[in-house]
UniProtKB/Swiss-Prot annotation:
It comes from Arabidopsis thaliana. It comes from the Eukaryota. Belongs to the disease resistance NB-LRR family. This is Disease resistance-like protein DSC1. The gene is DSC1. It is an enzyme of class 3 (hydrolase). The lineage of its organism: Eukaryota, Viridiplantae, Streptophyta, Embryophyta, Tracheophyta.
């Protein structure tokens, strides 16, 4: 007999029992319980009568589980005993599962053949005539063996026999599930989703009926998930039923037939007649409550279906579970069920599912990786799309793939379209219109904005939008409406009805448009141009979005929009033009425009070419009017009904003289007149705009005054920036939150400013005439940001008598303030800037105790303010992250400076009196000491080091010509050790990425690369052969260095980097390329230095980088596949990415970094490269032995152009130790 595993067996359960004892009681009940759970159990009645032992043994061999019911007379039957021997043979050879049940017999009696199990063997020749002694011995051994298998015991007096039968049946079902192949191999991601779903089902709760709704868009896998759960769990219930595809089946055969099927299945009664369906649940309540049920209602789309089929929870036994799959989450909310929103596949799962279908593998073929990514981007984790497209593209060439992907940009795949369209067909007419409008025109827009636009004739569509969300056709993300790309493509196809109409046949559309039963939405530029130039509009056209970016200039008739009486959305724009750019007029209306539809709710026309809007246009339905960069001189010359208007944007309409006609815009919320340079005044009726929230008058340079008191109480944002003719600030609403007055010529703020209780941002930057601030400034309790930079006549800052606990940003650069007030209660200040003051300003106020001062200060800018000393207690600024002291007269830093443990960015540029630097904070990432021309000495170490070092850092000492040799050696040595500690720490964390920025970078004035760089060359490029086993497990990175010659270089961009392009070449001439940065500077936008950086001499730039990328290519083996490396260096301004020609790399060098070896560590200690001071206090948290344990010098071939470089000593194995 061939052995086989239980999982490959054909049948479920074989029952071995003594019929005389248990056929009509225990075994009969057990077989029924198994059958109820869909388990095929075999009883050998027929085979006994035919005495067909061979067929019986064949059935035993092909069963997954054998259940043996030992009863009083079991051992009296030779047939049973032969079954038992065969079962145990299969257990040994096929790993068949065996479950013994000791039915009212003692387990030890079976094992030792005592009592009723001893009787048959006392006179075997009488009990078993013709049976050999050898076979009888095998029976005894089988009884003894079987009795030692874990099983069930039914005692003589048992009141819970029925419960035990159910327990055995459930356990058998579980065992069969464990034995069977999962069937989920192709169902990627199913296990994690099953796990999440089971948490909601609360299996342990046996007192409550739980209803769970699996919700998701069509094709996302709801039915598949429910089916997997049903197959796995149904055996644990007394009854179960899976009603598939209720949406379709209820229409075909009716709900009554589905209810009949449900009841007959869960009650296990094929002949059941439910009678009148109205009260069927009540009639069968007793029977329903007698069983724990598992019911799945699949693809439900109507609440009536749930109520009809499920009834009420009170009619079911506690512990029952009802699972509903639906596209409409609102249905689950209505019946108070729990929702499980089925997520799309993540990137890894999507790649696997697609690859299984397209390549019969878990990963794509290498040559199809790019095309595969395009498919994944299209499908966005949708299982149905991934399977359909994978099957379609399987075994196709790349040309077919490219053609298919190109078609998918505008056309759905047929099989996908058919499934998706079912969701659309279920919508009401109003829901369809809203869905198509969103898909064609308003995807990714703010939900409140879209709702306002789509409201038609006073009908609120917010409920419709919610319905579409509930039906999984759209989603809300950050309050914006989104949808799956495939749904949008389907919607556009439905809207165009390309195959039915032939939209490009404009004449047909004009003649037969009245036969169309749908609204037309147009966005194809060619179609729209044909329509407009020939004046063939129809009242079926609902929306036009015309992108002019690819159009040539064209003339339009004055009647271009004639006949489009139901046009609601009109947008003419240039997708290549940013919001602020001046429009190129491509649509010319030489004879003006005689008609615009009165149904317009949305009118956007970037660069509207006319001086006015058609006189006959009635804007009663207009909600959004955007005509930026237009030629308008006025909107309309008389008052019109604009009660629906909410948004108006006429920005950069340089000919606009007045904006009358908005007096009746009682719902207007936003008015943007930015850049309307001809606008001299606003109408007084602006005070009638009771809902106005936002008013932008930026750069209205002719605007001299505002209406007396803009008292509209709703105004939150007022922008007057750049209104250079505005001399007086009027009274405005006290509810304003953002007030921008920068660039105006106002001389003062009104005393009533204190009443602006909600003001959060006040910008007075470059108000050159402003001389004083209100003494009650501190009463602005909500003020978060105050900008006074450039107020050159402002001499006094008022006292802050009470804590302004909301104020976080205070900028006072380039003012005439000579003294700071004694009282400055700013407990929450985070950013303070006082750059460019001419006097000696005291900054002691910033270093108060945490309870009074600025313990939360993170950014402090004090450049060019004549500071000569910092307070000794500066270390108390525990939150400080950025500090700018450039251009001051500081000679040294206080000892407490290294207590600034959160300091990351430190700017000391142009501190020309600074002579030395102490130990700096441990977490410092960026230090810029450019042109500290008196700087001679540096602390050693410059920052504390730790064995687990992780802080990347860049130290710039350009133009520090007095930096002595010890300081340079200390800087280089510190950078070396820090970088190796970091690289080693990364290796220990099993980091396998590649960081394009340096672990440590430094720059200082010098003409030579340090001698321990064993690979050096003149010029900007370097090529070296790599020694065998160079990339062993201890390799951690590269050290790179260059000398850059500057020829009167001036860095106006404040960005500069030395870059390297590296190539590691394989034996087969293939190579791996990567780019990274050695060192440089990139001044943050918060840097307020006015001086540009000038360099005229040679400087050394050095960078250390972890380079695990080369390991990724060939793994961790000691056999390195790279045999040659080359490096090319260049400099760039980091803004334009162009190389700087006035800077030249004249020398370059490279060394390899490794985890240390013992002999290297000892030698490094002896050479004493860097004297690591251990007397820097508690912040210097490392021991020299610890450092040496983690540091090993660079090694490699000691090569130099023209011979060995002095200072490099060659070791036997061609590895060197740096001295």
């Amino acid at each position: 007999m061939e052995s086989s595993s239980p999982s490959s067996a054909e049948f479920d359960v074989f029952l071995s029992f003594r019929g005389f004892d248990t056929r009509n009681n225990f075994t009969g009940h057990l077989q029924k319980a198994l059958r109820l759970r869909g388990i095929d159990s075999f009883i050998d009645d027929r085979l006994r009568r035919g005495d067909n032992l061979t067929a019986l043994f064949d059935r035993i061999e092909k069963s997954k589980i054998a259940i043996i019911v030992f009863s009083t007379n079991y051992a009296n039957s030779a047939w049973c005993l032969r079954e038992l021997v065969k079962i145990l043979e299969c257990r040994n050879s096929n790993q068949q599962l065996v479950v013994p049940i000791f039915y009212k017999v003692d387990k030890s009696d079976v094992e030792k053949q005592r009592n009723s199990f001893a009787v048959p063997f006392k006179l075997p020749e009488l009990t078993f005539p013709g049976v050999t002694p050898e076979e009888i011995s095998s029976w005894k051994a089988a009884l003894a063996s079987a009795s030692n298998i874990l099983g069930y015991v039914v005692k003589e007096i048992s009141t819970s026999e029925a419960k035990l039968v159910d327990e055995i049946a459930v356990d058998t079902f579980k065992k069969l599930n464990d034995l069977a192949p999962s069937g989920n191999e192709g169902l990627v991601g199913i296990e994690s989703r099953l796990k999440n779903l089971e948490k909601l089902l609360s299996w342990e709760d046996l007192d409550t009926v739980h209803i769970i709704g699996i919700v998701g868009m069509v094709g996302i896998g709801k039915t598949t998930l429910a089916d997997c759960l049903y197959g796995r769990m149904r055996g644990q219930f007394d009854g179960s039923c899976f009603l598939t595809n209720i949406r379709e089946n209820s229409g075909r055969s009716g709900l009554e037939s589905l209810l009949q099927k449900l009841f007959s299945t869960v009650l296990n009664d094929r002949d059941l007649e439910i009678g009148a369906p109205g009260n069927a649940h009540e009639r069968f309540e007793r029977r329903l409550k007698s069983k724990r049920l598992l019911i799945v209602l699949d693809d439900v789309n109507d609440e009536k279906q749930i109520r009809y089929l499920m009834g009420h929870c009170k009619w079911y036994q506690g512990g029952s579970r009802i699972i509903i799959t639906t596209r409409d989450s609102k249905l689950i909310e209505t019946i108070k069920g729990r929702k499980y929103v089925l997520p799309k596949l993540n990137d890894r799962e999507a790649l696997k599912l697609f690859s299984l279908n397209a390549f019969s593998n878990s990963f794509p073929l290498k040559e199809f990786e790019g095309l595969t990514n395009m498919v994944l981007d299209y499908a966005k984790g949708h299982p149905l799309a991934l399977k359909v497209l994978g099957s379609d593209l399987c075994e196709r060439d790349d040309l077919y793939w490219e053609a298919k992907l190109d078609r998918l940009k505008s056309r759905s795949h047929g099989d996908i379209y058919e499934v998706l369209e079912t969701s659309y067909e279920e919508l009401t007419t109003e829901q369809k219109n809203v869905f198509l409008d969103i898909a064609c025109f308003f995807r990714s827009e703010n939900v409140d904005y879209v709702t306002s636009l789509l409201n038609s004739h006073g009908v609120d569509v917010s409920g419709v939008v919610k319905d579409l969300v509930d039906k999984c056709l759209i989603t809300l993300s950050d309050n914006r409406i989104e949808m799956h790309d495939m749904l949008q493509t389907m919607a556009k196809e439905i809207s165009l009805k390309v195959e039915t109409i032939g939209i490009r046949d404009c004449r047909w559309l004009s003649r037969h448009g009245n036969q169309c039963q749908w609204h037309i939405r147009l966005w194809d530029s060619e179609d729209i141009c044909d329509l407009l130039t020939e004046g063939l509009g129809t009242d079926k056209i609902r929306g036009i979005f015309l992108d002019t970016s690819k159009l040539r200039a064209m003339r339009l008739s004055a009647k271009a929009f004639q006949g489009m009486y139901n046009l609601k959305y009109l947008k003419i724009y240039d997708s290549h033009c940013s919001r602020g750019c001046e429009a190129e007029f491509k649509l010319h209306l030489r004879r003006g425009l005689s008609f615009l539809p009165n149904e317009l709710t949305y009118l956007h026309w970037h660069g509207y070419p006319l001086q006015s809007i058609p006189l006959d246009f009635d804007p009663k339905n207009l909600v959004d009017l955007k005509l930026p960069h237009s030629q308008l001189e006025e909107i309309w010359d008389d008052e019109k009904d604009v009660g629906m208007l909410k948004w108006v944007d006429l920005s950069h309409s340089i000919n606009l003289r007045q904006c009358l006609g908005l007096a009746n815009a009682h719902n207007l919320e936003r008015l943007n007149l930015e850049g309307c340079t001809s606008l001299k005044k606003l109408p007084s009726t602006i005070n009638c705009l009771e809902k106005l929230i936002y008013l932008n008058l930026r750069d209205c340079t002719s605007l001299r005054s505002l209406p007396k008191g803009i008292k509209t109480q709703s105004l939150q944002t007022l922008i007057l920036s750049g209104c250079s003719s505005l001399k007086k600030f009027p009274l405005i609403s006290e509810n304003v939150e953002v007030l921008l007055l920068d660039g105006t010529v106002i001389k003062s703020l009104p005393e009533s400013i204190q009443t602006f209780r909600r003001l959060a941002l006040l910008n007075l930057k470059n108000c050159k005439k402003l001389k004083h601030l209100s003494s009650d400034l501190y009463k602005l309790k909500c003020l978060q940001e105050l900008i006074l930079s450039g107020c050159s006549q402002l001499e006094v800052f008022p006292e802050i008598k009470e804590d302004m606990e909301s104020l976080e940003i205070l900028l006072m650069d380039d003012t005439s303030i000579t003294e700071m007030p004694k009282m400055m209660h700013l407990s929450n200040i985070k950013t303070f800037s006082l750059c460019g003051t001419s006097s000696h300003v005291s900054v002691s106020m910033f270093f108060m105790p945490p309870t009074l001062g600025c313990s939360r200060l993170t950014d402090l800018y004090l450049s060019r303010c004549s500071l000569y000393k910092l307070p000794d207690n500066i270390g108390g600024l525990s939150s400080l992250q950025s500090l700018c002291l450039s251009g001051n007269n500081i000679e040294n830093l206080p000892e407490s400076f290294n207590q600034l443990n959160n300091l990351k960015w430190f700017d000391l540029k142009f501190c020309k009196m600074l002579k030395s630097l102490p130990v700096l904070p441990q977490n410092l990432q960026y230090l810029d000491a450019h042109e500290c021309e008196s700087l001679e000495t540096l602390a050693n170490p410059l920052t504390p080091l730790t064995v687990g070092e992780r802080i990347h850092s860049m130290f710039i000492f350009s133009n520090c010509y007095k930096l002595n040799q010890d300081a340079q050696a200390s800087l280089v040595g510190h950078a070396r050790i820090k970088s190796q500690l970091m690289a080693n720490a990364s290796a220990k964390r099993y980091y396998r990425g590649f960081v394009p920025e340096p672990l440590v970078g430094i720059c200082y004035p010098a003409t030579e690369i340090p001698s321990w760089f064993c690979h050096q060359r003149l010029g900007r490029s370097l090529e070296i052969p790599l020694p065998p086993h160079w990339c062993d497990i201890n390799f951690v990175g590269l050290a790179l260095s260059v000398v850059v010659s500057f020829k009167d270089y001036e860095d106006s961009a404040k960005r500069f980097s030395v870059k390297c392009c590296g190539n590691f070449e394989n034996k087969d001439s293939s190579f791996t390329r990567f780019d990274f940065t050695l060192a440089g500077w990139n001044e943050p936008c918060g840097s307020l230095s006015h001086e540009s950086r000038k360099l005229t001499s040679d400087h050394v730039f050095m960078g250390y980088n972890s380079c695990f990328l080369v390991k990724n290519v060939h793994g961790e083996s000691n056999s390195c596949c790279y045999t040659k490396a080359s490096f090319e260096f260049y400099v760039t301004d980091d803004e334009t990415r162009k190389k700087i020609e006035t800077c030249e790399v004249i020398k370059c060098g490279m060394s390899l970094m490794y985890v240390p070896e013992d002999d290297d560590c000892m030698l490094l200690k002896k050479t004493n490269i860097v004297q690591l001071s251990l007397k820097s206090g508690p912040s210097c948290s490392y021991d020299l032995d610890d450092v040496m344990d983690d540091v090993r010098p660079k090694r490699g071939l000691c090569q130099f152009v023209g011979g060995e470089e002095p200072g490099c000593k060659r070791r036997k194995e061609e590895k060197i130790t740096v001295r």
